[in-house]
């Protein structure tokens, strides 16, 4: 998600992709030829599969005898056949950290106690929060969790799907960075990500692609930028980030997104509901907006109310210097921000309803 790996740059940068001619079907044909070639060798050795060849060095030989070769190379021709067949893959660790967190949290819930946990995390730790959410549902402890919320503080680089499918009462805080699919399908709770050891105002990429994908609820605060497809299919989640890449808010139907930085191309494609408040930092801003996105509009009283509340929450959760600077310029917000979606013409009743919803989030 830092876009620094050569393989990733080739995949996402049009200027590099243009250097590769051909079609996907040609790659498929290449692998088909390789498979047919392997099959012909298997027939020569009169075996049914590659598994039958593994370890059979007796089928190998030296093509050219060279006296200058070290004698130790002849050891390569010793048979290494084992009674145990290798499965052909390596089993991935099934989430030791996730199981540990679940065990501690469930123990606290059965005693009707809140749990506060701190652990280091690595990118091998995937779907943190999903397992415990499932266990809470299976054991019908949802109401107990709401009354006794759990707070999980982690440090490091979290793996895929950090905070996926979490529910009300689960609060995740990460000092570091996270991979793709943060908050995927989350229905409640909160996720906070604070980059470790950086003072950059919004420039740091703190999380990967498809953040908040398909979320139905909950709150997400990231003190940094995120990758492509931020908020896709969001129907109820609330999030504040400090910039994002292409395809943000695609097919969004509900919820509220606040973007305190630049956006990528194709913003808002197919968006039919919800609201996105964007800080206008780019020249030719309109060029980044999809033709199928809702028309942008000026901020109204509800937008100002929500922006103020969520900026304060963002600062409270992350300590964001960027958000602090923006909060000082409240009188200029109408010029600084534009809004997609939401209610254009508001009444006093609408404002009262918005205030009640914001208060209910605390």
Which residues fall in each region the model found?
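Long, distal/terminal scaffolding or interaction modules
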Residues: 15-48, 54-57, 77-362
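Short, solvent-exposed coil/turn linker segments
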Residues: 49, 68-76
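Short glycine/threonine-rich loop-to-helix capping motif typified by GTGT followed
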Residues: 56-71
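Single conserved hydrophobic/aromatic residue that forms the stacking wall/gate
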Residues: 1-8, 12
């Amino acid at each position: 998600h830092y876009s620094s790996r050569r393989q990733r740059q080739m995949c996402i940068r049009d200027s590099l992709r243009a250097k590769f001619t051909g079609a996907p079907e040609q790659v498929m044909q290449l692998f088909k030829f390789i498979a047919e070639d392997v099959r012909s060798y298997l027939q020569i050795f009169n075996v049914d599969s590659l598994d039958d060849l593994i370890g059979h060095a007796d089928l190998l030989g030296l093509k050219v005898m060279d006296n200058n070769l070290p004698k130790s190379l002849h050891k390569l021709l010793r048979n290494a056949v084992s009674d145990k067949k290798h499965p052909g893959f390596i089993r991935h660790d099934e989430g030791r950290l996730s199981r540990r967190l679940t065990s501690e949290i469930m123990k606290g819930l059965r005693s009707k106690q809140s749990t506060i946990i701190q652990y280091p995390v690595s990118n091998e730790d995937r779907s943190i929060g999903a397992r415990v959410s499932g266990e809470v549902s299976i054991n019908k402890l949802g109401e107990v969790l709401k009354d006794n919320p759990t707070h999980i503080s982690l440090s490091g680089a979290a793996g895929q799907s950090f905070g996926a499918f979490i529910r009300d009462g689960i609060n995740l805080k990460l000092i570091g960075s996270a991979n793709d699919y943060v908050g995927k399908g989350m229905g409640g709770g909160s996720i906070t990500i604070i980059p470790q050891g950086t003072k950059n105002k919004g420039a740091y990429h703190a999380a990967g692609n498809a953040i908040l994908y398909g979320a139905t609820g909950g709150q997400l605060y990231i003190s940094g930028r995120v990758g492509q497809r931020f908020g896709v299919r969001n129907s109820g989640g609330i999030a504040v980030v400090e910039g994002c890449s292409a395809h943000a808010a695609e097919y969004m139907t509900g919820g509220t997104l606040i973007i305190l930085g630049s956006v990528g191309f194709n913003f808002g494609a197919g968006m039919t509901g919800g609201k996105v408040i964007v800080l206008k930092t780019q020249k030719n801003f309109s060029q980044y907006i999809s033709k199928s996105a809702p028309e942008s509009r000026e901020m109204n009283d509800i937008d100002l109310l929500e922006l103020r509340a969520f900026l304060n929450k963002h600062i409270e959760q992350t300590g964001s210097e960027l958000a602090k600077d923006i909060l000082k310029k409240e009188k200029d917000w109408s010029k600084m921000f534009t809004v997609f979606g939401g209610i254009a013409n508001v009444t006093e009743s609408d404002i009262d309803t918005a205030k009640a919803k914001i208060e209910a989030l605390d």
